[in-house]
Amino acid sequence: MIKKICLAVALLIVMAVVPAKSQQVGSWSIYPVFSGNNNNSLVDTDNKVFYLADGWLYSYDKDNDESVFYTKMNGMSDTDISGIYYNYDKKFLLVAYSNSNIDIVRENGRVDNVPDLKSVILTVSKAINSVDFSGDYAYIATDFGYMVVDCNKCVVKESFNYGKAFKSIVVTDKNIFATFDKKIYVSSVGESHYELSSFKETNIKQEMKLLKIDNNSMLTTTGWFYYIKIGEDPTNLAMSVIEKSAPSNVSMSGSNMVASYKEKYIVVSPDGTSQTVAMPSEIDGSHLSTIDGKGLWNLDSKGLKEFSISDGSVTILHDTYRPNTSTVSEPYYLTYQNGTLYSMNSGRNYKGASNGKSVMLSSLKNGVWNKLNPIKVDIHNNSYKSLIEPYGMAIDPFDSEKIWFGSFFEGIYCIKNGKQIQKIDHLNSPMYLDFVVCVSDLKFDKEGNLWFSFYNFNKTTYAPLYILPKDKLYKENLTADDFISIDLGNFATTYGSQLCISKDGRYVLLGSNMWKSKLAIIDTNGTLTDISDDRVAIVATYNDQDGKNFDIGYIHSIKEENNKFWLGTNTGVGLINNIKAAFSGNVVVNRVKVPRNDGTNLADYLLDGVSVNDIAIDGANRKWFGSSTSGLYLTSSDGSEILEHFSTENSSLTSDEITSVACSTDDNRVFIGTKKGTFVYESDAAPSQDDYSDVYAYPNPVRPDYSGHITVAGLMDNSLVKITDSMGNLVYSGRSTGGMFVWNGLNSEGSRVNTGVYYVFASQNENDKSSGCVTKILVVK
C-alpha cells in the first residue's frame, strides 16, 4: 500500500510539470478542409447529418453535438470522394471515390470496404456516376454500364460491362431506368441484362440525372427540374416541369423530396404536387436537407445549422457549427512563424499553368484554425472582379497578423483580420500594367523591408525586383518614389519566380522560373536599402563540383542555411556552398552524393531526376524535400544520407505530389502540403534550446498499455542524454537530435523497464556534470 501511495504522489508531481503534448514520434495526422465555397452534398438522417465539402466527408451527431471528419486514419479506405448516397431504408451511407473504390458507413459508425471495382482491371473508365438502392442492394451506374453491390456482404453481386457510360440509374420494384446515349432507357428487373439490348428506349430523348421518389415516380435534375410519372407502360413516361432551373441539392424527407435553391426550397410529393417555400434573405438555401420535414439543416459558407420557418420567420434550432478546419484544400504555401502555421493556395497549377482559383488563406494557432480570406479588397485590373491566383506569402516579422501576398492580376495585398490594409500595383509603384500586374514571390529581410519579384514579360526596361522599405510599408499614399528598383540588366522573370534572402541579409537570390531558369545573385554588402554598393551576378549555366553541366530547367525552391543555398529543381537538388564565387564567375552548384554503402566507392546524386517542389530545414538542420511525384524525403543535414522516404505506399500520405513543406520552430512537427490537404508528421527532431531549464518528457506517465516511443524535448543541441533508474543504474543513453531525444522504454537488454521513476540527465559532453537531472519519467509496467 505504501508503494502505491508513493507512486501516486510521483504521478501527480510528474503530470504537473508536463506540457500538453501527446502525439507519438512517427505518427501522422491530417488537417481537414472546409472552405465554405465547395459544398457538394448534404444528407439529414435520423441521428446524423452527413455533408460533403471540398471533397471531404463530415458527419454531425445531432444528439451529442459531436462532429466527425472521415479519413483513412479513422477507418476510411481511400481519399478524393466523388459522391455520397444514403440508403434511407437500411440506414447506411455509400461513399464513392474518384478511383472507383467504395466504402459503406454503417449507422453505428463502422466502415466496410467494397474494393472490387477499384481492383478490377478494365480498358475503359470505371468512374461511378450514380447510385440507387433496393433493399441491401446498391445499383451503381458507371462509365462502362452498371453493377449491383450486395451492401450487406460487401461484394459485387452482378456487373454488366456494355462499354457504354450509364450516367444515371434508378431501380423500382419492377424496372431499372438508366440514362445513356442522351436518352432514358428501361428494362424489367426480372429480365436478363447481359446484353445492352435488354434496355428499351423510353419516350424521353434527353440525358438526365434521375432520382427516385418511390416505385411510381422520379425526379430529374439536369437543366430544368422535372417530375416523371411511371405508368403501366414504363417506356411511356409522363414528364412535367417543376422549376425552370436545376436544384443544387435534393434529399428525401419522409415520403417526399426536398429540392434546394439559394432563395427557396421545393417539397415534391410522390403524386407530383409541389410546394415552394421562400427562404429568408439572411439564409443561403443552396444546400438543405430534412429527414422529417420539421427542422431544416442548411450548409453554407459559414457552416452547418438547423432552423425552421413559420410565417416567413426563422427559428434557429441548432446554432451554426463550422468545423475546426483549414480553408485551403491545396496548400501551395506553408509558413510557420511565431507559433502559427499559415497556409495559402497558389495561382498556378502543378504544371505551372495559371488556374484562376480564388485566394484561400488560413492560419493555425494553439490547435484552432482561423479563416483569413480577405472579405473585401480593391480590384483594378481583374475582369473577374474577384481576388484570384495568389503567389507568394510573407508574414510581417513585427506583426504576425499582417499577411502579405502577391497575385497574378493585382500586384500585392496586405491583409489583417480579413481586411485589406495595403495594396501595391501599377497605380502606386514602379510596376507597370500589361494586362496584369503579377508579383510572384515576396520576402521580408531581417530589418523588415519587403522584397518582391515582378513578372516583367521580358521587358527588361522594367526591373524584376523591388524593395519597399520598412518605414513605407503601411504608408497611405504610396508613390513610385517610395520603392527601390533593383536593375538586373536583361534578367527576365515570369510567374512562379523564387526569391530567397539570407538570414544575415547579405545575399538575395532570385530564380527566373523561365525554361533554363537563370539565377540572379545579389550581394547587398549588408546595406539592405542602399543598392549603391551591391554586386550582382547572373548565373545562366550550372556546373557541378566535377565540372559537369547540371541541366536545370526550372528552379522551384531556394532555401538558405548559413549562407549555403539549397536549390530544388525539376531535375534534382543543387547546393551552392560558396556563394561568393558567383561574383568571379566561378560559382559551383554541388550535386550532393549519397554513398551506396554496398562495399564499393560508388554514390548516387541526391534525388537525381526527381522534381523537387519545396525544401524545409528542421531543428536538427536536416533537410526535407517535397517532390512532384514520389513523396517526401528526409536527409541528413548535409544531404549525404537519405534517412526517410515517405509515400502513399508506406505512410498516411494520400498523394505523392508534395506541394509545400514547413517545419515548426517550436517543436518536432513537420507540415506537409499536398494536392489533397495538409498533413502533419511528428518527427524525431526539434529545435534546440540555450539551456536545460525547460526540459520535459511525454507521454508522462507511461502507462502499461503504451508501447511507443518516449520523447524528451527542450534539450540543448546534440546533448548527451543518460537515463537511469532510482538507484543510479544506467538504463539507456544516446545523443539528442537537435533538442529532442527518443527512448523506446527498454533497457540495455531489450526488455521493458520495471515500474518506477526514471531520471533523465543531459549534458553537452561526457565530462560536463553541470546539468544534473533535467526531468523525470514515471513508468508503470
Regions from the language model: what does each represent?
Residues 690-722, 740-743, 768-771:
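Glycine-centered coil/turn sites that cap beta-strands in beta-rich domains
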Residues 736-769:
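Short, surface-exposed loop/turn motifs with a glycine/proline- and acidic-biased composition
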Residues 776-781:
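Short beta-strand edge segments in extracellular beta-sheet folds
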Residues 531-535, 707-709, 755:
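Carboxylate-dense, calcium-coordinating segments in secreted/extracellular and ER-lumen proteins
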Residues 8-16:
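Bacterial N-terminal signal peptides
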Residues 720-731, 758:
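Short, glycine-anchored, charge-dense loop/turn motifs used at functional sites
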Residues 4, 21-695, 730:
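Carboxylate-rich, polar loop motifs that coordinate divalent cations or form catalytic acidic clusters
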Residues 1-7:
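Bacterial N-terminal signal peptides that target proteins for export
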